[in-house]
């Protein structure tokens, strides 16, 4: 009874259903911050801003157009504005159709037309609504085009410079001009526009290797590229170039009005031109160097043109002090210092990352960015500033939510900004709501059912479903039942309705079983189901109806609005490639896959794995894999030593990719040794479809027990058969009509053939061969007695299994038999009443052949027990 109970318990444990377990890979570190710990792929809503509005500078009264494009068509676009008159105020949504702002939408592109006025200047944002999910663009600035002079003096005297030929001259013409955007410059000599060899920054005119032809009066003009406004600068420069032979030797020096040092600010990626002022006689030679920048001059991006140094594709590490050293052999030499600042637009290198968070928990998000000047970090929660949230706290680069609420669910965005622009990154924040216990009704005549106790279990509903587009007419729903101690759920039903007036809820026909009451993870149990026969270009809502063990039901909260986009209007999702199906165990395999090198993982939320036996043409079983960085996944339980076919597809919040190519793999064959599979992290597994994989697998212990019992039964049957055979042999030996020769053969059947165990020695087959004289006498007797009814005897050759002990025993027995027969022959042929066939044959032979000596054949008495086997080798025919 104890063995039976243990076997049943072991059987129940072995047949328990396993779930699909993901094998997680370590996500690669971000290339820009490999020193930091890398996060997994941050949850993405599947939508993003493809093209944010750009900052513009326009003249007053002009009309500008701001454009915004999203990866998918949203339900609607909105624009927000913050006026430059009140920079401390917040953003306000614009009313469309007004005189100063007009919004139009074409698919996933929105355009805002703005009339440039003092009250329309400021910052603008584009906001895309995807149900309750809000995605906000970076900020675009609208500024007024302007050009003005700073500290202008109308009666400024012109500069008069006298230099020898061969020198290089630098004239700073535009130091008095302030322009937005930066002005373009035109230069004139004696009223005629010239094209300088080098176009400097900030209105600097650089004349290299001047000659007598370079003499004249120089002037400049600034033009605003946005408004076209032109300003003629009042200052001018009169240059006189003398032949080098007539000039006296002078050390390198600066001309009147030339700066003793320079400070230049440039944007990263631009070309930088450094110009060195100073003249001398003879013209000095220039050597460039930098104490701050290693290899500043001797590299592929730098070129030296005498008094000018050009650096292309400027980088942040090019910032520093540059020294222009001039020497013509006349002391002292001249050193000119130029300070270079390289500004860099902001770039987020560590985006925020959030996982499924329980309502009421504390959440800390980090956002790290680079840029020069150091960017400012701010946060938006579904389009709303975190500054206005009472639960939010900003600490350096962190956003801390002291208590996560339902309204925080959605898209959390981090923005980094400086004067060069903005950059943003976001994460999808999912909030697991608290289960609110329904209050009991006070009063009334409600009576509990007989099977209910005083404490009734609550019906905890499932979470709202997440919706993913599968095709133009179908979607995939994913939901979860949080851990709870309420009534068990039996089945689910899916309900959906088209958004609009007088649209009723429709229920699918499929009953989705809950499966075994086992939690997939600490958060609960996950489920998936598909809904078909939908109409593209329509908006739907979905909810899950749970049916409980008390035959009551309760529905989940409604999902967000989902717009079923046609496939032609969607960007294709990256298609995973199945690389290998690893035989993990007898009931599990591990899928390994990869993505193309140019695939955008930010579009991916997870993967769907489909599988079925290769011999089946039925529906596929499904498993959900969360995370874009996953590259392997364990599928279990499966049937032992069975071939399966697998395929994968990636998915996001709004679409799914094409299927990967089918790939086959099998589970391992049963093993004789007992092994235990390692326990891995549980993953999401589709439990909505009844699985044929719920068949049980025998454990090695149970298999050994059953096998041992079968062996014992076989041994018992063999023993019974041997006993019956011996009894049959004995009954045959008692038959008086049986020929004596046949009886003689039966007497020497070895008892070893009936042994039930294998501990005996190999069976020895002993055969009796009559001597030739006896055979002749027997043949003569048979010819004489034609009517004899005895069956003929067919002789078999003797065969021995060599055993020296038996051979010695057989020889001694033969000698004893010979002596006995000799004594019997000497007693006048008396046979002591033993009138058997052997004696009759001998007598017949003696009568027919009187001249031949008589031959007597005798059978010795029957031997009992094992002595019969041991002495049987001596009973060959003996002649006397």
Curated annotation (Swiss-Prot):
GO terms for biological process: axon guidance; compound eye development; cuticle pattern formation; homotypic cell-cell adhesion; maintenance of protein location in extracellular region; segment specification; smoothened signaling pathway; wing disc anterior/posterior pattern formation. It is found in: Membrane. Residues 45-142, 132-232, 252-340, 346-432 form the Ig-like C2-type domain. It is a single-pass type I membrane protein. Residues 665-678, 688-697 have a biased composition (Polar residues). Residues 426-467, 662-697, 728-762, 775-880 are annotated as: Disordered. The chain crosses the membrane at residues 704-724. One of its GO terms (molecular function) is hedgehog family protein binding. Residues 725-880 are cytoplasmic. Residues 461-567, 575-670 form the Fibronectin type-III domain. Heparin binds at residues 497, 501, 503, 541. Homodimer. Heterotetramer; 2 iHog chains bind 2 hh chains when facilitated by heparin, heparin is required to promote high-affinity interactions between hh and iHog. This is Interference hedgehog. It comes from Drosophila sechellia. The lineage of its organism: Eukaryota, Metazoa, Ecdysozoa, Arthropoda, Hexapoda. The gene is iHog.
